[in-house]
Amino acid sequence: MDVRQSIHSAHAKTLDTQGLRNEFLVEKVFVADEYTMVYSHIDRIIVGGIMPVTKTVSVGGEVGKQLGVSYFLERRELGVINIGGAGTITVDGQCYEIGHRDALYVGKGAKEVVFASIDTATPAKFYYNCAPAHTTYPTKKVTPDEVSPVTLGDNLTSNRRTINKYFVPDVLETCQLSMGLTELAPGNLWNTMPCHTHERRMEVYFYFNMDDDACVFHMMGQPQETRHIVMHNEQAVISPSWSIHSGVGTKAYTFIWGMVGENQVFDDMDHVAVKDLR
């Protein structure tokens, strides 16, 4: 488990390139036959990836010990979106088939969660967010057909994109975790511009569907003290509440967003006009 401490905005603006990457970038999300895990002190979110290839992968009791509990989800909820080949997730003996871009919400209290791929040649890639939970909601699979897509932006401003809200109150109940997937239309480069912050929630972005020769310049920092982190395929970035979170790519891309905090009101944002950015 990689533990990341909280950081004050006044400190963050003094960091150089490597300092920013050390604090906020999750560089390696998927490792064959293992789970990766980054624990942030910011709202106690955990992010990572699970890629079973030649064997099943489960999160062992050692994680429970690190969290001060008996097992991983004793006091937590889990959201998973599969960006790879078809796979399965077995929760306390109940097996769920999770295809490409299918998702699974696992409620607090699940003791055994086992991840597997159907075909080792095209392994599943389970990207997950995990947050503290106060009560148990039912484990539920969510497919792309159950998510009402919303298209925003314009080709003229290079920000036409489709937002798919997987784990939001209109789809299913969670304690605090919200997750979704945003896909840019071909030829579009910007996400979340004009940008915003949200004082009441933190957020994590996971960028994927990027060619090897492509990158995204992820914008962060306070609106009047902006910085950037260069992102490559299948990397994640932590965004504190005080930070904007936007990006521009060399080509179109897709990203998964996950939020935890005070509420689950998607539109609860503190908008920032482009003219006010520095």
UniProtKB/Swiss-Prot annotation:
Q: What Enzyme Commission number does this protein have?
A: 5.3.1.17
Any one Gene Ontology BP term: D-galacturonate catabolic process
Which controlled-vocabulary keywords does the entry list? Isomerase, Metal-binding, Zinc
Pathways per UniProt: Glycan metabolism; pectin degradation; 2-dehydro-3-deoxy-D-gluconate from pectin: step 4/5
Q: Which family does it belong to?
A: Belongs to the KduI family.
Catalytically driven reaction(s): 5-dehydro-4-deoxy-D-glucuronate = 3-deoxy-D-glycero-2,5-hexodiulosonate
Q: Name one GO molecular function term.
A: zinc ion binding
Q: How is the cofactor bound?
A: Binds 1 zinc ion per subunit.
Q: What quaternary arrangement does the UniProt entry report?
A: Homohexamer.
Enumerate the cofactors the protein uses: Zn(2+)
Its annotated function is as follows: Catalyzes the isomerization of 5-dehydro-4-deoxy-D-glucuronate to 3-deoxy-D-glycero-2,5-hexodiulosonate.
- Residue positions binding Zn(2+): 196, 198, 203, 245
Which species is this record about?
Escherichia coli O45:K1 (strain S88 / ExPEC)
| The name this protein goes by in its record | 4-deoxy-L-threo-5-hexosulose-uronate ketol-isomerase
Q: One Pfam annotation, family name?
A: KduI
Which leading EC class covers this enzyme? isomerase
